[in-house]
């Protein structure tokens, strides 16, 4: 049985992840962390029913991970929190599933450095839904055939999302750019902005949109639009818990959803 910890346990994604841990076989909740609701039963906070796992202060993470015999921590928080959590989790010899987005290059290096230094494993992905990772593969294939077309990415999310563009939009841009040997990214346009051989990236924020990503390949006289829509955050939570089960048999190092889907 895999013992899983959840950071941001009181949050929207934290609660969904806990629900999915309860539903899946081969994994159980062993620890939960947050800055609020400390000492409360996490099941009551998540409204899943009493689980006999209390929410712990993140300041006590190292001790709690050891005492609870946690094998893997699932982290969907914010970039500064994940950067602070990663060295603690890796230092305790515990694997990590990271769904946080919006990292700077320096923050990403800090996280990966902690994992490599401690010989643990991590899956780092901007999106854990199976559908969106198939979406990336479709974009890769399409770009091979439409390399001369203009490429624009439009993403839309709820009005509380903290980072823009989304990690998924950036991953889509990177996949296309790598396929085409490198492209500049342009974020929105204003004023006189003649188009060059670039990938345009645009962010929309409004209402309760879970996550829409559209990639437009536009040529003379025609265009192709490839779109992924998330109807529920449960697609992300379910994929993250499956990744936590998968990583139990993975070797040390940094892994992606490509590794999981390909195995």
Curated annotation (Swiss-Prot):
GO terms for molecular function: 4-hydroxy-tetrahydrodipicolinate reductase; NAD binding; NADP binding; oxidoreductase activity, acting on CH or CH2 groups, NAD or NADP as acceptor. (S)-2,3,4,5-tetrahydrodipicolinate binds at residues 158, 167-168. InterPro entries: DapB_C (IPR022663), DapB_N (IPR000846), DapB_N_CS (IPR022664), DHDPR_bac (IPR023940), NAD(P)-bd_dom_sf (IPR036291). It is found in: Cytoplasm. It catalyses: (S)-2,3,4,5-tetrahydrodipicolinate + NAD(+) + H2O = (2S,4S)-4-hydroxy-2,3,4,5-tetrahydrodipicolinate + NADH + H(+); (S)-2,3,4,5-tetrahydrodipicolinate + NADP(+) + H2O = (2S,4S)-4-hydroxy-2,3,4,5-tetrahydrodipicolinate + NADPH + H(+). Catalyzes the conversion of 4-hydroxy-tetrahydrodipicolinate (HTPA) to tetrahydrodipicolinate. This is 4-hydroxy-tetrahydrodipicolinate reductase. The lineage of its organism: Archaea, Methanobacteriati, Methanobacteriota, Stenosarchaea group, Methanomicrobia. The gene is dapB.
